[in-house]
Amino acid sequence: DKEEIGSMGNTGMESHVFDTFISELLNKVRINRPNLLDKVFCNSRMLSADVDAGVDPLYAQVSDMNNAGIIGEGISLNKYTGSGGKYNSSDANAEYVAYIRKIFNENNIKYQLAELGKVDIGGGGTIAYILANKGVDVIDCGVPVLSMHAPYEVTSKYDIYSAYNAYETFFKN
């Protein structure tokens, strides 16, 4: 909740609400050990299912064309998200990126490696860095969007279907 305003507030990912929720789940199954929540996070894997900034041909100068999400080319994997270099960011480790690519390749998931924009021009944040700071292996994985946050946004049905297949494959593995 509240990702668009920095994940702050009493229900944002920066609050304790998520930790409390996971702790309550553990209590419901009667599992209670010292440092259990930390262990759960450190043994977890996550796809941060947020959208990616697709290349806008009218504003191509804000994209790094060698590393940009292209609409119609499948779901985007963003190893690194953030803005202004590596400030307030998440940078997935190489082993986790390789794991995700392996399961996507084995299941014929169409994906592309991308970033949110040129350093100091584009960029943006997701909740990935918050979970990464808790020890979760996480990578941003979402549909490229043309004109993100504009009154009209455009996505590709193929990319949406690719996302569906990617998320299903992730849960099965």
Walk through the language-model features, giving the residues of each.
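Generic serine detector
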Residues: S7, S15, S23, S44, ...
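Conserved active-site and cofactor/substrate-binding residues in soluble primary-metabolism enzymes
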Residues: M13-T20, D91-Y99, G122-G125, Y158-N165
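Alpha-helix initiation/capping motif
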Residues: S15, N32-R33, N93, L113, ...
